[in-house]
Amino acid sequence: MPGTGATGASVSTTPAAPEAGGGTVPFFYGSNLYAQKFGTVDPFQLTGTSQEFTYNVIPGGFLRGVRLQFRSSGGVGGTATPDNPSNLFSSMKFENVDGSEIMKPMGGYAYLQGARFFRPWDGDPSRRYDWAAGPNPSGNIFLRPEIRHTAGVLANTDARSQYRVTYTLNTAAGTITGGTTAPTVSVTKYAEIWAQPDAADAHGNPIEPLPPGLNLATLRRHDVKTLNGAGADNVIQLSLTGNEIRGLILIVRDSNNARQDYLSDPIRWTIDNRNLGVLSPDEVFDHMFDFYENLSNGTSTRPTGVYVFPRFYQPGRLVGEAWLGTTNATYLTWESATTAAGLNLPGTVEIIADEVVPVGALPMELESI
């Protein structure tokens, strides 16, 4: 029978207290993601004049970025302009606590392509459930300094120093042509955040207080160049050098601001005396399809006039290459003649650069992602 003849020490039925000593818990396991709405929703009916709005980002944790969810109502008639709904924003920017710009003023279409091609793991915003072009445009654009897995996050724990987001709503004619009633636009803003972890977990193990990606700063800038007349040569120089580059996007437009595939064969891409490629436009597009899964599997399409040159590594798919190092003296160019069949010229080439600035030791798993 159980217990008969037992002579050993008595056994306690009280659970033992947990013991510390399991080592330091990495930030990733001690934190969590959350989002918090901030600022007011200020409905605004589009007019013949653009309107600027500025909001302080709510403090707390480590900021990944700001999502702008835009909705419209009341618009009647008309035709969406080619870059609708993203061109609802004629300008967007994200400012540091000291007023310097982390994400420089650019149009909504430029930020749409930046979200799509510099943060491809978030997917194509134009394929989301709420993306709609027309007299009542809707969708969302994520202004995201963070790359992924905390790389590039921003310390946002001091209520005395706040980040700011500013956007300018376009004119009615800039978004809709021929409409009888302009839409009223509402923009809801969310701060996307890594939470500040507790000092220790439930077992008393200390938790890393800071994310490893805090040692990396990111920057988004653009540069607009002239596209010469039909058949003329273009030497398109990037003036935004001095940091490591994660990726570059060229957006080519005619004089009517319509996007066009106007670069011709060959496109010579060079940095100082080093050749980065002598490519046809088709080869540039093939490289895009090689690198971006949503292009190769057909869930997204390449936008007309958009040429992408990624310079980062996707760990999950084992594709890509290292960040492209530059100095202030770096001479980086693309040389290509404007196609002979081009119309409505001269036009423009907008260069969008996604840059990184290491400010401390960076874990290898975050290098070149």
Q: Which residue stretches match the model-derived regions?
A:
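Beta-strand-centric surfaces of beta-sandwich/beta-rich domains
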Residues: 1-369
